[in-house]
From Swiss-Prot:
Annotated residues for binding of ATP: T65, P66, L67, G68, E69, G70, K71, T72
Annotated GO biological process: tetrahydrofolate interconversion
Protein name according to UniProt: Formate--tetrahydrofolate ligase
Keyword Amino-acid biosynthesis: no
This protein's encoding gene: fhs
Organism of origin: Aliivibrio fischeri (strain ATCC 700601 / ES114) (Vibrio fischeri)
Enzyme class: ligase
Length: 582
């Protein structure tokens, strides 16, 4: 079989104006970005406002191996399968960060014959939204240090009188807004800025700082959760970047930089329209990670897609304890549209990996034993699959398990898994997906079962309400969402929690940043652990995004590169063809 990029480069694609027209978009709704992608003007929603919403299908997965279990392949393949059945359908996915593209996982366009195309354009820059977010974010960083420099250089009173601006009196030791870049670079996690020659301050005042990956920026979450340009502007203005010498929050509005940040992101608020290899329209917008942010594509993209097609297929990052949980508890209440069906992706290798019988390490190849028949490992890993089925069902949604088939899978083990799921006494269906090898033809049975599931009445119920305290919300996610015994706040986190509630932020949602390698916060614990403790070492306020960000365990907001990064495989030939991208 050809490589992903070879399949994509030899595919016959439809011009984007035709894709948009067939979708119901007008010429003035789109701004073409070359022949095969276009920006969709958010104003299209005003014209479509009276149209009914279609069905929203949310794709999730079991606890994944480091290489993933094929959520995006299934998302794209399912959309193609629905189209082959004659249904009106679109897909919504996140824009890939170049960190993973050059790091461990590679691209995020799907794979095989279920890809978004052109995949090299999707995986590398696309229409520049991530770069716009990086620029807007770092503009705020520059504004913070410039304000500290000028206020301290002149003195607060002189600065205020000279510039007719209030002195913000930012505490340099209490700046909470790190800089960002769209690469994995562990050397930038902790840096010292403002270094000068002895006795000089021309480079600013020295302080400790650091970098996060752009996908972890609050601006990325804001872009994904904003409902229109005005909402984007208001959310950016609420961002807390530092605290003053009295412990009071300093916002981007206080710095008078929020307007310029929004201007920098003006074009980024418009989703990018692409297509699958089979011509299914696909909206690509925003890219928050699910382990260090809320891990879902944008509300704006969903809203446009839901107005234009009868079915919209989207995905939440990592397992159902991660992006799916955050879609239900953070995204859905803001979008006022809950999912109609959950599709849970499982693989034989992923189930075996959750048996706990094999060592798994990020950046390393999967043990070869995962690809061989092994009844003991398969049986031992079923607890994880059952946990994720129950987790999706607890939100009041019908569940369809999609078994993503790999070439080495045996029919005997596949039949065993099909029978096991079919015999569960609950509202769950199951089908094998061969989206990677067969495209939409490999998901026809899955598509039929998803259509059937979408006809059911849902009883969607998030885990918590906005009226609950922040502590109770954190406990709700840990206990109801993960099956933990309780949360355990560090002394620092306790102080931060008290501060946030004192400042009036108790109505915000909570976003857990934890390892995706386990339902718990310890990536070495596989299966379906119970009665464990969720340690929260630090809390971060994301007032613009509308959530409190809880750092659990040792999760990093700036990834590092592995021993053998994916960028080693990339090159370009004399004709400009990219090779080695996956």
């Amino acid at each position: 079989m050809k490589s992903d990029i070879e399949i994509c480069q030899t595919a016959t694609l439809t011009r984007m104006k035709t894709i948009a027209s067939n979708l119901g978009l007008h010429d003035d709704d789109i701004t073409p970005q070359g022949p095969f992608k276009a920006k969709v003007n958010i104003d299209a929603l005003k014209r479509l406002k009276s149209e009914p919403n279609g069905k929203l299908i949310l794709v999730s997965a079991i606890t994944p191996t480091p290489l993933g279990e094929g959520k995006t392949v299934t998302t794209i393949g399912l959309a193609q399968g629905l189209a082959k059945l004659g249904e009106s359908v679109s897909a919504c996915i996140r824009q890939p960060s170049m960190g993973p593209v050059f790091g461990v996982k590679g691209g995020a366009a799907g794979g095989g014959y279920s890809q978004v195309a052109p995949m090299e354009e999707l995986n590398l820059h696309l229409t520049g939204d991530i770069h716009a977010i990086t620029a807007a974010h770092n503009l705020a960083s520059a504004a913070i240090d410039a304000r500290i420099y000028h206020e301290q250089r002149l003195g607060y009173d002189v600065f205020s009188e000279k510039n007719e601006l209030p002195a913000l009196r930012i505490d340099p030791q209490h700046v909470v807004w790190k800089r960002v870049m769209d690469h994995n670079d562990r050397a930038l996690r902790m840096v010292t800025i403002g270094k000068n020659e002895d006795g000089k301050t021309i480079n600013g005042y020295e302080r400790e700082d650091g970098f996060d990956i752009t996908a972890a920026s609050e601006l990325m979450a804001i872009l994904a959760l904003a409902t229109d340009l005005q909402d984007l502007r208001q959310r950016i203005g609420r961002i807390v970047v530092a605290y003053n010498l009295d412990g009071e929050p300093v916002t981007t509005e206080d710095l008078q930089v929020a307007g310029a940040m929004t201007v920098t992101m003006k074009f980024a608020i418009n989703p990018t329209l692409m297509q699958t290899l089979e011509g299914v329209p696909t909206f690509v917008h925003s890219g928050p990670f699910a382990n260090i942010a809320h891990g879902n594509s944008s509300i704006i993209a969903d809203n446009i897609a839901l107005k234009l097609t009868d079915y919209t297929v989207t995905e939440g990052g990592f397992g159902s304890d991660m992006g799916f949980e955050k879609a239900c508890n953070i995204k859905a209440p803001l979008s006022e549209k809950s999912p109609d069906c959950a599709v849970l992706v499982a693989t034989l290798r992923g189930i075996k990996a959750n048996s706990g019988l094999f060592p798994l390490s990020p950046g390393q190849s999967l043990p070869k034993e995962l690809f061989a028949p092994n009844k003991e490992a398969l049986d031992a890993g079923l607890d994880n699959l059952l946990w994720h089925i129950n987790n999706c069902a607890k939100y009041g949604l019908p569940v369809v398990v999609a078994i993503n088939r790999f070439p080495e899978d045996t029919q005997e083990e596949l039949d065993s898994l099909l029978n096991w799921v079919s015999n569960l006494d609950m509202n769950v269906d199951v089908a094998i997906s061969e989206a990677f090898v067969k495209g939409g033809n490999g998901t026809l049975e899955l598509a039929e079962k998803v259509i059937k599931a979408c006809q059911q009445e849902t009883q969607f119920t998030p885990l918590y309400t906005s009226e609950m305290s922040l502590f109770d919300k954190l406990n709700a996610v840990a206990i109801k969402g993960y099956g933990a015994e309780r949360i355990e706040l560090s002394e620092k986190a306790q102080q931060q929690l008290a501060t946030f509630e004192k400042l009036g932020y108790q109505s915000l949602s909570v976003c857990m940043a934890k390892t995706p390698a386990s339902i718990s916060t310890d990536g070495n614990i596989k299966g379906a652990p119970t009665d464990f403790i969720v340690p929260i070492r630090e809390l971060k306020l994301c007032a613009g995004a509308g959530f409190i960000y809880a750092l659990c365990g040792n999760v990093m907001t700036m990834p590092g590169l592995p021993e053998k990064p994916a960028f080693m495989n990339l090159d370009i030939d004399g004709d400009g063809n990219i090779v080695g991208l996956s």
